Amino acid sequence: MGSKNKLKRFNENETFDNVFQPKREELVEATYKMKGHWNAKYFKNDNPLVLELGCGKGEYSVNLAKKYPNKNFIGIDIKGARFWRGAKTAIEESIPNVAFLRTQIELIDYAFAENEVDEIWITFPDPQIKYKRTKHRMTNSEFLKRYKKVLKANGVMNLKTDSEFMHGYTLGLLHGEGHEVLYANHNVYKQEGSPEEVTSIQTHYESIYLEQNKPITYIRFKIK
């Protein structure tokens, strides 16, 4: 994507009511105005709040919002030029129950209050395979601690990935730390019992992975 195109998308994001782009200091140096108030101030209801972390173009968030109109969805990514597409689609198609937040995943507990979130999706994250990149894996112990801060007591996590490494690493970590694995599937399109929302929604890149015959894996779990 050219720099002019990126700039155009950044500028357009500023005009979207469904896009939130707080500066880092707004999050860490004071209580962010939306923290603890996403449902009341933006969605104007008490429906379950669901996050998608590293949402990319926002395809999954938008399609989940279409599928579950009685839930509220927020796609989170540091790259606003990416989720511009999802935000624009939501406006064009009048989808009221999805919004987008531009921030680092590491700051999630600054953007959301304790017990504010019902469910979290992590879709096709960078597996950060090199050992020195372990701290950046979105299911490592430190990230799980952050997620637990904002999740309700019965909140659930979902990991959907084409990376067999990420799938295996996460399963091992969950079992090793005593978290509750509710469901695990090594190939959601070939094994029976896959949740419908896992197989009925496909991102652009997921379609490419499937054309390459890469298995798509899925884990649903609770953080203890």
Description of each model-found segment:
Residues 139-153:
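A short glycine-rich, Lys/Arg-flanked "PGG" loop and its adjoining helix->strand segment in the class I
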Residues 154-161:
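Conserved beta-strand signature within the Rossmann-like core of class I S-adenosyl-L-methionine
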Residues 1-49, 59-66, 87-114:
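S-adenosyl-L-methionine
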Residues 71-74:
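Short beta-strand element of Class I
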Residues 54-56:
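Class I SAM-dependent methyltransferase "Motif I" SAM/SAH-binding loop
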